[in-house]
């Protein structure tokens, strides 16, 4: 069950341009959370911004009761959040949403991360490593300074293959292009994707063509975060029937072949 509470900030670091890693004392979330879920964070003490902001659970340490977030500053809410200092308290609600489905232990899986989309995938790879999966991470960003979490993935013994738009590190091009060249689709039990919409759409199309399963984590604009306001509706196709699902409640993770990409 999700809760609302004030979490004490334990640490804040800027890890890349405009990108912050933040640790909180949050034992209930650390205990309950599964990869792919998110917290809904109140950014600041005043009513501006009024709405909470959804941020994925980046990592948890269950024994220490610690929750970590990794976020990019894009507007007012994330700007205020990035200014919090150790000892400050941040009101949050969570864990929320439906997370990733784990494969059978020992499976060979692919993880595709674009930009800040790497954030929730670190927690996922942590759990995949616990069940001894063989993980290849296809990790992309604009340039080498913007590559995130490569060290964490390597530490968890995942194979990491990098793509940058400008070719300053690894393959020059996009993550889907890299996967087309590198990935052995027939041997991959499951592919997990989080990143820009265009990247998730391209990879979902490739997965459908290769007839292999995948899951994507959708980043929709959210109001309430708990299924009440319908502001996060996404079109999902199930047995040919298209219906609206709430990204905050039935998602944010959906099977890649069910998403109706706009
Ligand atoms: C399930 C989920 C998980 C997310 N996880 C992360 C993460 O781990 N790290 C990270 O950097 N970002 C993440 N985001 C995106 C993050 O929520 C937005 O960047 C943030 O809400 C922007 O708020 P702002 O006040 O800084 O920007 P503003 O542009 O001022 O925000 C205005 C409004 O738009 C909403 N909004 C703006 N951009 C987005 C967006 N991309 N997705 C959803 N709502 C948006 C805000 O919640 C707010 O209501 C996630 C989004 C979702 C839906
Ligand atoms: S954000 Fe309100 S229903 Fe999803």
UniProtKB/Swiss-Prot annotation:
**In which compartments does the protein localize?**
Cytoplasm
Q: How is the cofactor bound?
A: Binds 1 FAD per subunit.
Highest taxon, organism lineage: Bacteria
**One matching Pfam family:** NAD_binding_1
GO biological processes: 'de novo' UMP biosynthetic process
Give a Gene Ontology cellular component term annotated to this protein. cytoplasm
Molecular function (GO) terms listed? 2 iron, 2 sulfur cluster binding; electron transfer activity; flavin adenine dinucleotide binding; metal ion binding; oxidoreductase activity
Q: In which pathway does it act?
A: Pyrimidine metabolism; UMP biosynthesis via de novo pathway; orotate from (S)-dihydroorotate (NAD(+) route): step 1/1
FAD-binding FR-type domain location, by residue?
Answer: 2-102
Q: Which residues bind FAD?
A: 53-56, 70-72, 77-78
Statement: the UniProt record of this protein carries the keyword Iron:
yes
**Family annotation (CDD domains):** DHOD_e_trans
- The residues that the entry says bind [2Fe-2S] cluster are 224, 229, 232, 248
Recorded hits in PANTHER family, A to Z, give: DIHYDROOROTATE DEHYDROGENASE B (NAD(+)), ELECTRON TRANSFER SUBUNIT, DIHYDROOROTATE DEHYDROGENASE B (NAD(+)), ELECTRON TRANSFER SUBUNIT-RELATED
Q: Which family does it belong to?
A: Belongs to the PyrK family.
By what name is this protein known? Dihydroorotate dehydrogenase B (NAD(+)), electron transfer subunit
